[in-house]
Amino acid sequence: MSVTTSTIADLGRRARAAAPTLAVASTDQKNAALDAAADRILEGNELDLVRGEIEGISANLLDRLRLDGSRLEGMASGLRQVAELPDPVGEVTAAWDRPNGLHISKVRVPLGVVAIIYEMRPNVTSDAFGLCLKSGNVAFLRGSSAALDSNRVIAASIRAAVAGTGLPADALVLVEDVSREAAVEFMQLRESIDCLIPRGGPSLIRSIVDNATVPYVIDGDGNCHVYVDASADLDMAVSILHNAKTHRPSVCNAAESLVVHADVADEFLPVALAALDGVEFVGDGRSRLIAPSIGVAEDDDFATEFLDLKISVRVVNNLDEAIEHVNQAGSGHSEAIVTSDEAAAQRFCKEVDAAAVLVNASTRFVDGEEFGFGAEIGISTQKLHARGPMGLPQLTTEKYVVRGDGQVRA
């Protein structure tokens, strides 16, 4: 059944109405709701996989839909882990005294209603709820048609669990209309939404930029690079590249492009191709002269997030060319250098414009859980108000609290 514009607005009003209660909920209340929700995460995924296979969704995109026993356990475990994390609400981030006797402090407070519009992965329903609740925010969610059945079941389970602990069920509000018109209306609920976070591909991001009238944080493309420097330990480089590309190719922190210094390209590329058997390599002319099995890369390939077992290759003469290429073709997500030259590592870290830069480590580590944040709401590729993995602190804002004893301004 299609949900009308007025109904979407009603959902927004419900989310807004629940926000004040969540903003002042105690840590114990929030943790109890998280633990209860973890116990209620059950089923509803089989239909989505069947539909996906019928509609011809690729295997790697089906991986985003899959919620087998281990992933369901992972969702429940993620909620419990968030319950164990420090509550950011009420944290004093700075405090000072003025000569006139005023005491000024900055205190973390919830954003209010955090809207998330996302594609494919139904586990986002659980992850987003957990982080929003622990940070005192309402989770206002709109998923994709492919995962609708799972999202409904997960949301219903969570809402029932939350209500059973005394907090409002509307701590999670799910929009079930998956039409484009509903998505645009969702992006424009200025009276209800404090922050919108998209979790999806380029078309979703373009839609947000073109249509959203609410504040948003872009969880953008992950066109991530691995640069193998002239001084690199080549065994280490192969291991890092293999992990970055093949561990989970459908996620945003997977490597999509390989950049190799010319001094080591002759030795490295044949070894890399052999190690990454099953991965399609497309490259520039220099890389194909070294390894003829590398396919011809179109210009767009160097700026493409493949989300599959495919990678582009470019050979460069020096670090300057590597940095220039990464900054030009990259998406500002995560970029890695493999090197034993500390000066090269420092230059790469300073000059590459990305949310995360890694030295001698896989791009797959750019993740809230790996960073110690617990589950993440996304990885921001913009610079305001958050950048990189967004955990609990990034779902708050700061309020100034000023205490005096009768001071007035002269």
State each model region's role:
Residues 1-103:
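N-terminal Rossmann-like NAD(P)+-binding subdomain of aldehyde/semialdehyde dehydrogenases
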Residues 67-68, 77, 179-198, 203-207, ...:
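Aldehyde/semialdehyde dehydrogenase
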Residues 96, 104-110, 133, 164-168, ...:
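Solvent-exposed alpha-helices and their adjacent loops that cap or buttress functional pockets
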Residues 160-174:
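A glycine-rich helix N-cap at a beta->alpha junction
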Residues 319, 324-409:
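C-terminal core of ALDH-fold dehydrogenases
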Residues 95-139, 144-154:
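Substrate-binding/gating loop at the entrance of the active-site cleft, primarily
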